[in-house]
Amino acid sequence: MAAAAVAARRLSFRSGLVLLQTTRGTGVCEPKVCCRFYAGTESLPKVEGSDITGIEEIVIPKKKTWDKVAVLQALASTVNRDPTAAPYVFHDDPYLIPTSALESRSFLLAKKSGETAAKFIINSYPKYFQKDIAEPHIPCLMPEYFEPQIEDVSEAALEERIRLRKVRASVDMFDQLLQAGTTVSLETTNSLLDLLCYYGDQEPPADYPFQQTEHLENLEEAAEENNQTSKMESGPWKAQNNAERIFALMPEKNARSYCTMIRGMVKHRAYAQALNVYTELLNNRLSADVYTFNALIEAKTFILNEKFEEKWNDILDLLKHMVAQKVKPNLQTFNTILKGLRKCYSLGRIPALQILREMKHIGIEPSLATYHHIIHLFYPRDLSAIKMPSLIIYDIMNELEGRTFSPQDLDDGRFFQLAMSVCSSLRDLELAYQVHRLLNTGDNRKLVGHDPLRKVYYSKFFSLICSLEQIDVTLKWYKDLIPSVFLPHYQIFIGLLQALDVANRLELVPQIWKDSKEYSHTFRDALREEVLMLMARDKHPPELQVAFADCAADIKSTYEDQSARQPAFDWPANPLQYIAVLFLRGGRSQEAWKMLELFKKHKKIPRNELLEEFMDTAKASGSTALAIEVVKLASAFSLPIGESLAQRVVMDFTVDPEQKEALGNLTELNSSDGESSSDSDSDDK
């Protein structure tokens, strides 16, 4: 009975799956069958021997295959970027976080050098690194085998050497097979041509500078043998190289053979030879693929001594050939044309727009590189020479608003840098914000380009903010971008200081100077002078003057350090002036008076305003001796203000007869020097 009851509760489905339906009832002997397929109805009583009708089919959903790092991606999406943290590529250690572009490059090279050394050890001793501890599997962490395992002369040995990218060994094995009378298959010969054309009949660059000694020695011997020949050739594609020799020896050639040769010649700048091979392909009534046509278009655009009309007609002829051979263009086809039109400057603008319309007409979505080439055509580097710049960038940004992109072209990473440079030239902050919003949409941030392009982008963006944005917003961007996103150049700090000056927020100048020191801009003369000028230009409340004096003392120490390291170092006149003024206003009178000695030592002439400041300080302290020293300094430099300073000493200070006589002598000496200088000037006339 129990078995029959269980069997009755089994329900069959069309999908082939049999599910055991569980029941719950009030008693053990009288289970109640619950049917959930009709909402709002009572449970149907169990009737033995009768079929259950009206049961809805259950569709089992298909199993979804998740990415192996889906959990990590989900966790990463819940965390925002920390603006106070160092870039992830560097070690989170105070001594290993770079403070300048030079240190950043050095640290990255050191890190890459360590990775390369580790990989060299793993590949040199693979038997010690057989355990795979990574989950999921990471192929690059496991040893790679570079040495061929097949020793005999066979086509399999040739295929192995091709797979290992052994250019010279592959050519030697091919020659041995021909000498033995063995016919190499067309597929293997084409693979050998792929290898030779890709590397230009040269050995691939060594992954490790301290590896493959024999390979380097062979390269040196080859360089000595071909030294005279290489001087006569303009490009790296050598005439009658192994690729051309093997191509000529092939008893049978197919379209792949010709296409490989064409792409290899274009890659290594043998444009005329590539066009000749294409003519041979047409004579043999073969068709090229889209990648070969892309290479041919590139060859047409790089041929010298041709006018725009000739180049454009040649490109149109190639497009007609594609139609005749039923080859559908791809994104790279149009991007190659647009990149070639950049060499035509303003003449290429109308054809570029025609190309863009044609792309959209046949359903090819433009990439960031497409718009990069168009912006490059319409906005030259010097926009100041153009009275009415084009407005096409506004149309482009409106079209790209809110879209996400994936890398499809090598020039995709150049779009954001060029777009932000145009925003900077147009002085349009709203457009810059629009470009930055696009950068932060989805994963577009990954397409900002390599480190130099990324630095140019953020430098242009932040400089534009400093010039046109309110100071509170500027400071917010400053904290958000520096140093977590990019390391600022000293000109970035100068722009920020000028923004503080416009907003009358000079109390932040000492903090900006402190930050600039952290980024290795301590000895930048333009930055130091800008900081001192802003602090010394106007008078401020006493507590702020004290902070300015402390900052001036810090800057003075940098000049002293520079003077100690460079014996021939000469103090500039303006910093001496500014530091002395700041010391006087900040209550550091003794240090200010010592600055006068530096004027004499470095033969710099103080300004009249500085001498007046010293006289005011002497009057405030009631020191007649200090006032006379100021007059002596003016007299030593034969300054016209010396006489008025002497009169001020007599009027504002208590002067004894001896001091009064000294002042008179200084005045007479100063006047006689002035007369002699005027006489010499009249004699010269």
UniProtKB/Swiss-Prot annotation:
Residues 676-685 have a biased composition (Acidic residues). It comes from the Eukaryota. It holds the Pfam family Rib_mS39_PPR. The modification N6-acetyllysine is found at residue 127. The keyword Calcium does not apply. One of its GO terms (cellular component) is mitochondrion. Residues 1-10 form a transit peptide. One of its GO terms (molecular function) is rRNA binding. Its main location: mitochondrion. Component of the mitochondrial ribosome small subunit (28S) which comprises a 12S rRNA and about 30 distinct proteins. Associated with the 12S mitochondrial rRNA (12S mt-rRNA). Mitochondrial RNA-binding protein that has a role in mitochondrial translation. This is Small ribosomal subunit protein mS39. The gene is Ptcd3.
